[in-house]
Regions:
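Asparagine-centered strand-capping/turn motif at beta-strand->loop junctions
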Residues: 52-56, 145-150
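Bacterial N-terminal signal peptides
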Residues: 10-19
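Intrinsically disordered, low-complexity Pro/Gly/Ser/Thr-rich segments with frequent PxxP/GP/PP motifs
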Residues: 74-103, 170-196
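Beta-strand signatures of extracellular beta-sandwich domains
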Residues: 63-69, 157-163
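Terminal connector regions
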Residues: 32-35, 43, 98-140, 189-210
Length: 210
């Protein structure tokens, strides 16, 4: 009987040690990696459009910073944007607007410096459920956004990028959408006189919806 108790005690001790030193599964896999965010840049007269593709398996909070510099390398403006819910496998665009003078004219810039950081988002991503249709009319581009999710959302943002016939960016803007309720839609438009040219191509990115 004493031998049996000793064997049971030894077995329990082994089980406790194995449990204590066994690695916790899944924790490392859920931590997003900055290396899985691919970034591309397109500079134009009024600023820089930066696109981000999240190749992580979870939504991330993206904090992006961009500094504009003049010909001497002096920083003339610093911009910061936060995307609280960049969904897994989603591609978004952030428009960093160049600084303007007291008359509202864009201050010329020569170069820029960009940096970003990420963390796991605390929100659930519904950006795939926001659909936008576009209609390039004679004097304006008309858009209709609709929430096809079954949730009441609180934050929705889109970036719209306009290109000329060569593919160069001629204008960009970010819009906050208010189609928060299920099946709710929102109509909005962009006048071509803001662009100074009729665009040949329009790209729409849903930056976040949560």
């Amino acid at each position: 009987m004493k031998k049996l108790f000793k064997l049971l005690a030894f077995f329990c001790a082994v089980c406790i040690c194995v449990t204590m030193f066994q690695p916790v599964q899944g924790q490392a896999a859920t931590k997003p990696s900055k290396k899985k965010i691919t970034v591309s840049y397109k500079k134009f007269a009024d600023g820089v459009v930066v696109t981000y593709k999240n190749k992580n398996k979870c939504a991330v909070k993206l904090t992006a910073k961009l500094s504009f510099k003049d010909a001497a390398g002096t920083v003339i403006s610093k911009e910061k944007e936060i995307n609280n819910c960049l969904g897994a496998s989603r591609k978004v665009a952030i428009y960093f607007k160049a600084p303007v003078d007291s008359y509202g004219n864009t201050v010329p810039f020569v170069s820029y410096k960009h940096s970003f950081s990420i963390a796991k988002s605390k929100f659930k991503d519904y950006s795939k459920k926001i659909y936008i249709t576009k209609d390039a009319q004679a004097a304006q581009a008309a858009f209709t956004a609709i929430n096809l999710s079954d949730k009441n959302l609180s934050k929705i943002q889109a970036t719209i990028v306009f290109h000329d016939s060569t593919g160069a960016i001629v204008y960009s803007c970010m819009k906050y959408l208010n189609c928060y309720a299920p099946n709710q839609n929102m109509l909005f438009n962009v006048e071509y006189q803001e662009l100074m040219i009729r665009p040949e191509k329009i790209d729409v990115y849903i930056n976040y919806a949560y």
